[in-house]
Amino acid sequence: MTTHNRPARVAEEFRHELSALLARGLKDPRITGFVTVTGSKMSPDLKEATVYVSIHGDERVRKDTFAGLQAAAGFLQREVSRALRLRNTPHLRFVYDESVARGDRIERLLREARTQGQEPAADVEPAPGAAPDDEAEE
Protein backbone atom coordinates (compact mmCIF):
# COMPACT_ATOMS: atom_id res chain seq x y z
CA MET A 1 0.00 0.00 0.00
CA THR A 2 1.60 3.29 -1.09
CA THR A 3 0.31 5.86 1.38
CA HIS A 4 3.39 8.08 1.03
CA ASN A 5 2.04 9.39 -2.31
CA ARG A 6 -1.36 10.25 -0.89
CA PRO A 7 -0.53 13.86 0.10
CA ALA A 8 0.72 14.57 -3.43
CA ARG A 9 -2.39 13.00 -4.98
CA VAL A 10 -4.72 14.89 -2.64
CA ALA A 11 -2.83 18.14 -3.29
CA GLU A 12 -3.29 17.72 -7.05
CA GLU A 13 -7.01 16.98 -6.66
CA PHE A 14 -7.31 19.92 -4.26
CA ARG A 15 -5.64 22.20 -6.84
CA HIS A 16 -7.92 20.92 -9.60
CA GLU A 17 -11.14 21.44 -7.60
CA LEU A 18 -10.04 24.85 -6.35
CA SER A 19 -9.22 25.94 -9.91
CA ALA A 20 -12.69 24.88 -11.03
CA LEU A 21 -14.33 26.79 -8.16
CA LEU A 22 -12.35 29.93 -8.94
CA ALA A 23 -13.18 29.63 -12.65
CA ARG A 24 -16.89 29.68 -11.77
CA GLY A 25 -16.26 32.86 -9.80
CA LEU A 26 -16.78 34.08 -6.27
CA LYS A 27 -19.20 36.74 -5.12
CA ASP A 28 -16.55 38.79 -3.31
CA PRO A 29 -16.28 42.16 -5.13
CA ARG A 30 -12.57 42.39 -4.26
CA ILE A 31 -11.76 39.44 -6.51
CA THR A 32 -11.42 41.26 -9.82
CA GLY A 33 -8.07 39.91 -11.04
CA PHE A 34 -7.60 36.77 -13.10
CA VAL A 35 -6.53 34.08 -10.61
CA THR A 36 -4.47 31.06 -11.63
CA VAL A 37 -3.72 28.25 -9.20
CA THR A 38 -0.08 27.46 -10.03
CA GLY A 39 0.47 24.70 -7.50
CA SER A 40 -0.44 23.15 -4.18
CA LYS A 41 1.19 21.23 -1.37
CA MET A 42 -0.48 19.09 1.26
CA SER A 43 1.04 18.31 4.64
CA PRO A 44 1.74 14.61 5.28
CA ASP A 45 -1.17 14.43 7.75
CA LEU A 46 -3.51 16.14 5.22
CA LYS A 47 -4.38 18.90 7.70
CA GLU A 48 -2.73 21.82 5.88
CA ALA A 49 -3.11 22.76 2.21
CA THR A 50 -0.82 25.44 0.81
CA VAL A 51 -2.08 26.79 -2.50
CA TYR A 52 0.10 28.94 -4.75
CA VAL A 53 -1.78 31.51 -6.82
CA SER A 54 -0.83 33.98 -9.51
CA ILE A 55 -3.01 37.05 -9.95
CA HIS A 56 -2.94 39.06 -13.17
CA GLY A 57 -3.52 42.78 -12.85
CA ASP A 58 -1.87 45.84 -11.37
CA GLU A 59 -0.60 45.97 -7.79
CA ARG A 60 -3.89 47.17 -6.32
CA VAL A 61 -5.90 44.48 -8.13
CA ARG A 62 -3.46 41.82 -6.91
CA LYS A 63 -3.69 43.00 -3.29
CA ASP A 64 -7.49 43.28 -3.33
CA THR A 65 -7.93 39.92 -5.05
CA PHE A 66 -5.52 38.22 -2.65
CA ALA A 67 -7.40 39.70 0.33
CA GLY A 68 -10.66 38.42 -1.17
CA LEU A 69 -9.19 34.93 -1.60
CA GLN A 70 -8.03 34.87 2.00
CA ALA A 71 -11.48 35.98 3.17
CA ALA A 72 -13.09 33.22 1.08
CA ALA A 73 -10.68 30.52 2.34
CA GLY A 74 -13.23 28.97 4.71
CA PHE A 75 -15.88 28.72 2.01
CA LEU A 76 -13.37 27.31 -0.48
CA GLN A 77 -12.13 24.76 2.10
CA ARG A 78 -15.64 23.45 2.66
CA GLU A 79 -16.50 23.29 -1.04
CA VAL A 80 -13.30 21.49 -2.02
CA SER A 81 -13.57 19.04 0.89
CA ARG A 82 -17.18 18.33 -0.02
CA ALA A 83 -16.21 17.65 -3.65
CA LEU A 84 -13.27 15.42 -2.66
CA ARG A 85 -15.17 13.73 0.19
CA LEU A 86 -12.32 14.14 2.64
CA ARG A 87 -12.85 13.03 6.22
CA ASN A 88 -11.00 16.06 7.60
CA THR A 89 -11.04 19.47 5.99
CA PRO A 90 -7.48 20.70 5.37
CA HIS A 91 -6.77 24.25 6.51
CA LEU A 92 -6.33 26.32 3.35
CA ARG A 93 -3.48 28.82 3.10
CA PHE A 94 -2.90 30.97 0.03
CA VAL A 95 0.60 32.03 -1.04
CA TYR A 96 1.17 34.55 -3.82
CA ASP A 97 3.34 32.97 -6.53
CA GLU A 98 5.56 35.64 -8.06
CA SER A 99 7.13 33.34 -10.65
CA VAL A 100 4.56 34.17 -13.35
CA ALA A 101 4.88 37.93 -12.76
CA ARG A 102 8.67 37.60 -12.73
CA GLY A 103 8.59 35.67 -16.02
CA ASP A 104 6.32 38.30 -17.59
CA ARG A 105 8.68 41.06 -16.47
CA ILE A 106 11.71 39.25 -17.95
CA GLU A 107 9.84 38.63 -21.21
CA ARG A 108 8.88 42.32 -21.42
CA LEU A 109 12.49 43.41 -20.83
CA LEU A 110 13.76 41.03 -23.52
CA ARG A 111 11.15 42.32 -25.97
CA GLU A 112 12.17 45.92 -25.23
CA ALA A 113 15.85 45.08 -25.72
CA ARG A 114 15.09 43.48 -29.10
CA THR A 115 13.06 46.46 -30.31
CA GLN A 116 15.94 48.77 -29.38
CA GLY A 117 18.34 46.60 -31.37
CA GLN A 118 20.15 45.25 -28.33
CA GLU A 119 20.73 41.58 -27.84
CA PRO A 120 20.62 40.52 -24.19
CA ALA A 121 24.06 39.62 -22.88
CA ALA A 122 24.51 36.14 -21.54
CA ASP A 123 25.47 36.14 -17.88
CA VAL A 124 26.86 32.64 -18.15
CA GLU A 125 30.53 32.20 -17.39
CA PRO A 126 32.46 29.67 -19.49
CA ALA A 127 33.16 26.37 -17.82
CA PRO A 128 36.63 26.04 -16.27
CA GLY A 129 39.10 24.91 -18.91
CA ALA A 130 36.79 25.85 -21.79
CA ALA A 131 38.23 27.98 -24.56
CA PRO A 132 36.64 31.37 -25.28
CA ASP A 133 34.52 31.50 -28.45
CA ASP A 134 37.16 33.23 -30.59
CA GLU A 135 39.87 30.70 -29.68
CA ALA A 136 37.56 27.73 -30.23
CA GLU A 137 37.12 28.62 -33.91
CA GLU A 138 40.86 28.56 -34.70
UniProtKB/Swiss-Prot annotation:
Q: Is Cytoplasm one of the keywords?
A: yes
Membrane-spanning residues: none
What's a GO cellular component annotated to this UniProt protein?
Answer: cytosol
Q: What is this protein called?
A: Ribosome-binding factor A
Q: Which Pfam families does the UniProt entry name for this protein?
A: RBFA
This protein's major location comes to cytoplasm
Q: What does this protein do?
A: One of several proteins that assist in the late maturation steps of the functional core of the 30S ribosomal subunit. Associates with free 30S ribosomal subunits (but not with 30S subunits that are part of 70S ribosomes or polysomes). Required for efficient processing of 16S rRNA. May interact with the 5'-terminal helix region of 16S rRNA.
Composition bias, Low complexity: 119-131
The UniProt entry's GO biological process terms, in alphabetical order, are: maturation of SSU-rRNA
Alphabetized, the UniProt keywords read: Cytoplasm, Ribosome biogenesis
Quaternary organization: Monomer. Binds 30S ribosomal subunits, but not 50S ribosomal subunits or 70S ribosomes.
Question: What does the similarity note say?
Answer: Belongs to the RbfA family.
Q: Identify a single GO molecular function assigned to this protein.
A: ribosomal small subunit binding
Q: Where is this protein localized, as stated in its record?
A: Cytoplasm
Cytoplasm as a keyword? Answer: yes
Species the sequence originates in: Anaeromyxobacter dehalogenans (strain 2CP-C)
